[in-house]
């Protein structure tokens, strides 16, 4: 009888490996991505025809060329724009230095038949009422902005109550401040007996006429005052505005350097050569359309003077100033200045020194040239800054009061460095 087979014992199971760490269930989105990748891999890759490759290369090349072309157009446009700006700036500086229309020299005046010798009547038109301010063209105004270097601003007006007492027999104004009617929280004020030329000022072209030849451009008296009209008034300058390159001739500092002095209680005439030497010493050149400011030191003297001296000057105004001669007038015109202002009360010496009685510079400038005159400007702060940095040119603006037919106005002038 066959022996029954023994049951084989099952081998002991091997030791199980350590259970793996629990893995966070993957997000459904990740599984979906995995399935999509698997399906993509399972599908046989489509063959790309050579034609499609060529089309892609062509399209890419065209896009690259278009991009380069666009960049090139932009670069060329930028270069053109910069060139246009540079050309405009070059023209502005060129026009500022040399007027686009050649002006006659002093010895070539007059240009209008019947006008007196040395008169610029008709140069700016037979009906002109602003004279040499016409030289402040847009091109020159743009060029003048290059004189702004630091952004410093200097106000050139004295307070309207200085000089005190007023000079040249002018009256003293009164200033009244009052509460506005029916509004106790509002103040109002007004001036009585206000003389627009009692302090820092512009002389309008109507201010002085030649005793024989009359006013600028031959405009008759009956068109300047009364019912006949108000021509040559300060309103002409006010409506236009004054802006351009200013240049300071600091004659007072030049005198200090060379050991000269001025007695401000006398009518001493300062030679033209001193003005020219001051400009040369500063290293600044005049250009057509410049507004020349001449500092002789009078304002500094007056502000520190005693009450007795101020009272004496009010009683009899005796002041120094630049030489009031025809050669000075010739120099001013030949430099084609737009205007001239000074810190002195009359620009020139008054009363007229011996030998200069009939050479009143106001006749030449206002009546013959149409060149506005500024007087009693406060140039002290500006002069100190120019001496400190060595830059004697600046951008100058002035907004006279719009007084119809007025013969003068505070300048409301600013020098911007």
Predicted regions located by residue number:
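Active-/binding-site microenvironments in catalytic and ligand-binding cores
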Residues: 58-417
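Extended amphipathic alpha-helical heptad-repeat regions
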Residues: 1, 50-53
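Low-complexity, polybasic segments enriched for Lys interleaved with small residues
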Residues: 5-50
